[in-house]
């Protein structure tokens, strides 16, 4: 999800935003021309650069890694150096149409607090995360008795940045409890069995990666 890959046979010289076409369509449905986009943990700025080229968006990234910040500057992507664990207090309410949080929520010390802060500054939030409820993770933990590792979660338990792992069901229940509306949701799978499980409706068991677009429920 949210990796910028180049497929010139399909897009000419413009890179696609997602490896999964469903997710690409889902996100772009919430991005109009000249939309104000905030990319939290923007990396080298490739996503914002692509959206700027495709949709003429007004984008800004937040990143703490200095090398990534330099890459953003070389791509002419506006970027702020900031640690997301310290919040977004210096950003005004309703400053953005959409915020993007890509594979980052599970790394935060206060995931709920960050979500609330993001929804203060943006109307919609697009979140991607690895689903800890996937069948392969469950079976690995059951039969091996150790913290599972996968392509999405490749770290050892003692050096992982993922300090708040959660499942798809955990996420939907959090949204219900906090009065958040799930506008759209998409799933991406590499494994055939994961695709089958997701296809028959067992999404918490089948989904490997999740993209959700959320907003505050209107009072």
Feature roles, as predicted:
Residues 98-109:
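A short SAM/SAH-binding and catalytic strip from SAM-dependent methyltransferases
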Residues 5-19:
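Class I SAM-dependent methyltransferase Rossmann-like catalytic core
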């Amino acid at each position: 999800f949210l990796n910028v890959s180049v497929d010139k046979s399909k897009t000419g010289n413009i890179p696609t935003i997602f490896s999964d076409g469903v997710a690409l369509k889902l996100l772009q449905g919430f991005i109009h021309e000249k939309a104000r986009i905030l990319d939290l943990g923007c990396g080298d700025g490739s996503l914002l650069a692509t959206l700027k080229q495709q949709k003429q968006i007004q984008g800004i990234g937040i990143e703490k890694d200095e090398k990534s910040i330099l890459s953003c500057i070389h791509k002419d992507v506006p970027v702020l150096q900031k640690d997301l664990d310290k919040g977004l207090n210096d950003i005004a309410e309703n400053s953005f149409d959409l915020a993007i949080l890509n594979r980052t929520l599970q790394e935060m010390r206060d995931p709920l607090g960050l979500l609330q802060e993001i929804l203060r500054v943006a109307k919609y939030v697009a979140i991607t995360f690895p689903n800890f409820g996937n069948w392969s993770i469950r079976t690995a933990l059951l039969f091996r008795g150790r913290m599972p590792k996968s392509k999405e979660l490749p770290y050892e338990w003692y050096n992982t940045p993922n300090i708040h792992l959660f499942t798809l069901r955990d996420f939907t229940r959090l949204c219900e409890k906090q009065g958040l509306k799930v506008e759209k949701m998409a799933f991406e799978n590499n494994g055939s069995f994961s695709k089958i499980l997701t296809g028959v409706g067992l999404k918490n068991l089948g989904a490997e990666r999740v993209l959700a677009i959320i907003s505050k429920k209107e009072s």
